[in-house]
Amino acid sequence: MAVIKMKPTSPGQRAVVKVTRDHLYKGEAFAALLEPQHQKSGRNNNGHITTRHKGGGHKHHYRVVDFKRNKDAIPAKVERIEYDPNRTAHIALVCYADGERRYIIAPRNLEVGATIVSGSEAPIRVGNTLPIRNIPVGSTIHCIELKPGAGAQIARSAGTSATLLAREGTYAQVRMRSGEVRRIHIECRATIGEVANEEHSLRQLGKAGVKRWMGIRPTVRGVAMNPIDHPHGGGEGRTGEGRHAVDPWGNLTKGYRTRNNKRTQVMIVSRRKK
């Protein structure tokens, strides 16, 4: 892949940096794996905003991606690599030997025509999915399960991966990109390699309208509001917050830890690095 800097033919094009998609399939998505996606625009059944800064955006179908990879010992051939508007990673359409087709998250360096397989006896090769107990220590992995059979939940976005550090009894230690080290059961599955489209982080949208196409609405600063709307609001002319930064409901927003999941706290060996 390559990065393209657009010519400054207009203010909206001046700062645009795109990632090429020349290697991606240019036809329609596989219809049997498409589902309608109804946009809620951040509203509940009463029409009240429950999630701010959402609404509008381009309509698109949801691609049903196989995160479980549970067709063991059946080889699958990669038919094409596709763009997915629902995620930063690319997806690959694979055809199993029994004729079934599924979408998977496309790993880096996975070529069209390659053969992948899942299961405990699968070879250590990019795109193959195995239980963590069968993966060599030090391997780069992605699409990692947190519970056996629940489907991949970790390292699914573009360019991400994790490293298998050690195995102790029925648990393994996995280091995330953030630096967090987490204990994961060795029966959980993971895929060899890292997620493709690693240059996604170099992309620059160039204008606010692109965010609107993505269904993201503007974020208004609290200091620009009236005091009835935000704790930072009010004042004559330009004024500062006058207090520690808080959200519209008065909760601290900077440097305040929000994690509150005691049930899985014991699975974290070391917290992420800032």
From Swiss-Prot:
Does the record's keyword annotation contain Ribonucleoprotein?
Answer: yes
Per UniProt, the ranges with Basic and acidic residues bias are: 229-246
**InterPro entries assigned to the protein according to its UniProt record, in alphabetical order:** NA-bd_OB-fold (IPR012340), Rib_uL2_dom2 (IPR014722), Ribosomal_uL2 (IPR002171), Ribosomal_uL2_bac/org-type (IPR005880), Ribosomal_uL2_C (IPR022669), Ribosomal_uL2_CS (IPR022671), Ribosomal_uL2_dom3 (IPR014726), Ribosomal_uL2_RNA-bd_dom (IPR022666)
User: Which keywords annotate this record?
Assistant: Ribonucleoprotein, Ribosomal protein, RNA-binding, rRNA-binding
Domain of life (superkingdom): Bacteria
Report a single Gene Ontology molecular function: transferase activity
GO terms in the biological process aspect are:
cytoplasmic translation
Of the GO CC terms on this record, one is: large ribosomal subunit
Q: Name one Pfam family in it.
A: Ribosomal_L2
According to the UniProt entry, which residue ranges have a biased composition of type Basic residues? Answer: 50-60
Checking HAMAP family in the record gives: Ribosomal_uL2_B
State the family it belongs to. Answer: Belongs to the universal ribosomal protein uL2 family.
**General function of this protein:** One of the primary rRNA binding proteins. Required for association of the 30S and 50S subunits to form the 70S ribosome, for tRNA binding and peptide bond formation. It has been suggested to have peptidyltransferase activity; this is somewhat controversial. Makes several contacts with the 16S rRNA in the 70S ribosome.
Q: What does the subunit comment say? A: Part of the 50S ribosomal subunit. Forms a bridge to the 30S subunit in the 70S ribosome.
Q: Name it.
A: Large ribosomal subunit protein uL2
- The protein's organism comes out as Paracidovorax citrulli (strain AAC00-1)
